[in-house]
Regions:
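Short gly/ser-rich loop at a beta-strand->alpha-helix junction or flexible surface loop bordering the NTP-binding
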Residues: 1-148, 152-216
């Protein structure tokens, strides 16, 4: 454990089998530590230090580590996988989402397959400006997150709540959101609508829902 201490501390108590091996540990060492109650098995090839503070969305962190199990957190770049879509919204604590799957973007040309039924891999191009570090994870920016959700025709009510929360918390500028949302207005049944009008439509719906709920 002494050889893994700095690594697990930097990764919120998590470590992959490959990272441990590169640090000088062996698979049998990890098995012994699990049997001794020192480590907990989180996911295939991912362990957590028992008793360590359990950070928010630990399962999401474990799934992200699986995307490039040989790399430590500070060695990862956009090409190795980024938290995205509904999972990114969870990281920003916007909307009222309870997704059944963890979502990531892995830009081409890299290919990655997973057997996990609770993980969805999207293939899309990303620039350095599309991502940021959030609590030790590479995550799509709030603006890019909205674009990704809208491109999948994410439920309008939920998208509106995500956008409204971002505006309320100053996570995104309304002008930038208007420009980003403009190409998707027609897909949401509002052809000929400007991005600003679409944004107002989404946020007005949330205001109406809140008002109705308050009068019930």
């Amino acid at each position: 454990m002494s050889s893994l201490a700095s690594l697990t501390e930097a990764q919120y108590g998590l470590v992959t089998t490959r990272q441990a091996e590169l640090s000088g540990a062996h698979r049998r060492d990890l098995s012994r530590l699990v049997q001794a109650g020192v480590l907990e098995h989180m996911a295939h090839g991912v362990y957590r230090v028992a008793g360590a503070p359990r950070p928010c969305l630990t399962e999401l962190r474990a799934a992200w580590l699986q995307l490039a199990p040989e790399l430590e957190t500070d060695q990862r770049e956009v090409t190795h996988g980024v938290v995205s879509h509904s999972s990114a919204a969870l990281m920003y604590e916007v909307g009222l989402l309870d997704p059944l799957r963890w979502e990531f973007i892995i830009p081409p040309p890299r290919r990655f397959r997973t057997r996990r039924q609770d993980v969805t891999i999207h293939r899309a191009r990303l620039t350095a400006g599309d991502v940021k570090w959030v609590d030790g994870l590479l995550v799509t920016t709030p603006l890019r997150t909205v674009i990704d959700l809208a491109s999948l025709r994410f439920d309008g009510g939920h998208l509106g709540l995500v956008v409204a929360d971002m505006l309320e918390r100053d996570l995104a500028h309304p002008g930038d959101l208007s420009v980003a949302l403009a190409p998707y207005a027609a897909a949401y049944g509002l052809p000929g609508t400007t991005g600003r009008e679409f944004l107002e439509h989404l946020t007005d719906r949330q205001g109406q829902r809140t008002s109705h709920a308050a009068h019930r």
